[in-house]
Structures are given as C-alpha cells and as structure tokens.
Amino acid sequence: MVSCGSDVAVPAASSTSIPASTTTEADVPLPTGVLFAVPTQNREDPAKGQFQVQLHNDTDGRYDLTAVQFRWAGYTTPVVERTAVIVGGQTVDLPVPFPGATCAGDGSIDTMPSLDDAAVVLRLVDGSEVEMSVVDQFHLARRLYLEDCERQMIDAQVGIEWVDLHEEDVEGRPVTAGSLRLTRRDGTGEVTVRSVSNTVPYEFVAVDTAVGGSVAVLPDGVEQVEVPVRFLESRCDPHALAEVKQPTKFIAQIVLGDGTEHPYIIYPERSYWNAMRATADEACVILGEVEFVGQS
C-alpha cells in the first residue's frame, strides 16, 4: 500500500499551480509588500505524494535560490534542491514532498499546531537563508495535516491493502483480479469497508458482494479477512485512456469499531500500476469500445 508519506521522485519547478478547493470558508487575505508562500496542490500531486509551495515576491528584491523547505510543527519537508530566480512581482511554484503529519494530541483541528508559526525557507546561491511566512489561503496545509492524521489513526487500528493482484480472463477479456485484505492491529470491534469508488479507467467490483452490501467485514475478535475483487475497464474514451493523474486513487468508506465512518484511500502498490493499466486498455480494444477523437 502506498502511503502519503512515501518517498517519491519530485519534478522540477512548475510555473503554474491549481489550488485545491478544500473549503467553503472565506478566502484568507494575502499580504502586500513582503515575501510569502501559499501551499497549493495540482491534480497530479496527491498520487506523487507532494504539494507545491507557491512563492510570492511582492517586493523589489531578486532572489536566486538553490533549495527550499517547508517548516511547521505539523510537518516539515526535507530540504529540496530547486534552482529558480524570483524577481519582484513574480510568483513561482515549487514542488516539495509531503512527509506525513506529525500529529499533535488526537490529530484533530483542536490540537493542530498553529500555522502562524509555519515558514518556507529559501537557500540562496550565496549560502544564506531567507524565511518566508506561510499564508494558508486555500486551507491546503491544514487539510493535508488533518487527512494524514486521520489516515494514521485508521492505520493504527487496521491494515487495509490490495494483495495478489494479477491478470485474469473474464468473459474473453483481461482484467486485474486480487483480494482486499483487512488485518487487525490495535483496533477492537467490527471493521467494515462499506464501499470502494471507481476511478476514471477502472470499475471496482467486489466479487462476492451483493448489490448494496458491504465490500468486506472484519468481525470483532477476528485477526484477518480477505475478499476477492476485480478491476474492470471503466471508460474507453480518449480522455479516460489518457488519464494518468489519479488512475489508482480508490476511495473506500470505512466504519471502525467505534461506529465512526471515515474515507480511506487505498492505492495499489506502485509496482502494479503499469500492468493494471495495460490490462484495462487491452480490454477496451478487445471489446471494441475504444473511441477516437472526432469519432461520432
């Protein structure tokens, strides 16, 4: 299972970033006349385990940087080498890996460290450092913290993972088959996976689950269960076949032993991704459902 804190290869600086819409709260005002940083996230960033620090230079100064780091009691990234020049009036996005949250207290917003103390530190070509304040304009820094603390809480109670993924023939075309495994850790009581979402290229099927039934149940006192699953081709249109940003982001709804329900992302191990995609694409071809641009 791939976690949000996994080590990932991070690409070079990008010039644009699409902020994640995470809340209906009023926008946070941006300061003027200073250097500051805004955490943002592109659509492909979650699967890469990263986010962007959007650097705003609202001064007359020029900064030639060689590295960047996001520092906060909630999480601190490694120092990442980045080469960029930021002149007055310019905004530049730099990707940094999300390291996983350092959860305070129960990991809720009530015990979350204050973002007033967060900073982005730039290392300049002369070896000096410049510290920028963080403005969580889109509440992304907060969301990453809260979601990861929720995930860590679930992981401490039960392991949830895809296992034994392999190609299988179903009605004359290849599909990916395997099992969903639940393994008890520190949690007590019954744990239920109520549902698992589809993604753009894949339709999730719980083989032995009746319509409207739960995908998997780990009864109280039982240490482990596995249920058979399949990933069928979902869409075969050009947009679906070109989907590379979040093709394996399967979102499960989990009910823990205390009765609380939580979303939980179950990524297959990255080593499975290419084979899963090749199987779904081949199924589209065999079924004659591939659509081409301009085809009516």
Regions found by a protein language model. Name each.
Residues 56-77, 185-205:
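Short acidic, flexible loop segments centered on an aromatic residue
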Residues 4-8:
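Bacterial signal peptide processing site
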Residues 102-145, 236-272:
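Terminal connector regions
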Residues 10-37:
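N-terminal low-complexity, Pro/Thr/Ser-rich intrinsically disordered segments
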Residues 68-108, 199-239:
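Intrinsically disordered, low-complexity Pro/Gly/Ser/Thr-rich segments with frequent PxxP/GP/PP motifs
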Residues 152-235:
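Surface-exposed interaction/gating patches
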Residues 9-10, 23-27, 41-47, 142-182, ...:
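Acidic, serine/threonine- and proline-rich intrinsically disordered appendage/tail regions
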Residues 205-296:
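Extracytoplasmic/luminal low-complexity segments enriched in Pro/Gly and acidic/polar residues
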